[in-house]
Amino acid sequence: EKAGIGKSIDAIKRADIVLLVLDASEPISVQDQQLGGFLRENTKSTIIVLNKWDLVENTMMRKVSPDGKKKGGLADKDSDAFKNDFKQNIYASFPHLDFAPIIFTSAKTKYKIHLIFPLIFRAWTERHTIVPEDELKEFFKKVVKEHRPSRGKGTKHPDIVSFHQLHNNPPMFEMMIKFQTSIHFSYVRYMENRLRE
């Protein structure tokens, strides 16, 4: 297993876009989570491919009727509700990859294999995006107005002095704050999520 992970890490280092292929019929392993963390740390565009979807059995799930009352029932594995629930479980295991699209596939039956390449092209396009300066300024004003920056250490509320894009592939942005203030890491994460939108 260590040799396999070593090869995966070497391949990840050379890649811009990575397909994290998981067996949908098996629990997520510690090694899967470690690879997911490595992807995040190395700023790789990631697509989570849930393979072997044909082996996932229909499962008893609590269904909610339109009036909000819960009732038991058999949930179809191809229903949106079941897939959304499955996605939430995946994101709970990979919280650092909550930006990555998830696709349900089966290499054996060819189920939705054709949808992988459009996701790769989209990831490539987004990775090479340069946001025009005027759009970035508008985005920045809107985001700061909606959610004021939260302070990290200290008593002073942080003032963001500037926000601009340094480069693309991967897109890298710089936020400068006023001297002797600090910004909470959760606000940086918030800005990151808003940029992805």
Residue ranges and their predicted role:
Residues 1-10, 14-20, 26-197:
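C-terminal-of-GTPase-core extension/linker across diverse P-loop GTPases
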